[in-house]
């Protein structure tokens, strides 16, 4: 198999934080579905994480570690709805999730992230559906089910119901 490493921004946001490895940025480690991710700061830490069966996570917004590690595969799972700089020359195989990428031009393959029949479909030519700007319809609600903060800032945990339940 392949060793997996994650690069992340310094202040990641996730809609479902307990289902995101990005929490390792804040907590040092994160576990999702039995996969343990550990924040690392050096190549030695990276090797230690791999030897422990963990996924190492670098805080690396510029992607410098991609050039240093020379991976066999790069997967852009930022879900920014646009390409923030991922290129086919970053690795022998490049994959991107969601809109903003064209398979064969920007990356080798694009994976559809829009709800519906094509969710998860891999495109080797062409692109995922464009971003509609409207959240998916769940129970008849779209934009109404998304809460937007009135200002920038950090929201500290008061209570974590997911951890209380175990």
For each feature predicted by the language model, list its residue ranges.
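Well-ordered secondary-structure scaffolds
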Residues: 1-166
């Amino acid at each position: 198999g392949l060793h997996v490493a994650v690069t992340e921004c310094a202040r990641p946001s996730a809609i479902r934080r307990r289902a995101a490895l990005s929490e390792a940025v804040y907590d040092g480690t994160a576990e999702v579905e039995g996969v343990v991710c550990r924040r690392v700061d050096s190549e030695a830490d990276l090797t230690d994480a791999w030897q422990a069966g963990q996924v190492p996570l670098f805080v690396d917004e510029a992607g410098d570690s991609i050039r240093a590690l020379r991976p066999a595969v790069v997967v852009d799972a930022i879900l920014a709805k646009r390409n923030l700089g991922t290129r086919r020359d970053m690795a022998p195989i490049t994959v991107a999730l969601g809109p903003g990428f064209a398979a064969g031009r920007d990356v080798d393959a694009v994976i559809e992230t829009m709800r519906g029949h094509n969710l998860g479909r891999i495109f080797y030519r062409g692109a995922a559906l464009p971003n509609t700007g409207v959240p998916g319809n769940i129970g008849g609600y779209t934009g109404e089910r998304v809460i937007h903060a009135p200002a920038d800032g950090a929201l500290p945990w008061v209570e974590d119901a997911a951890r209380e339940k175990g």
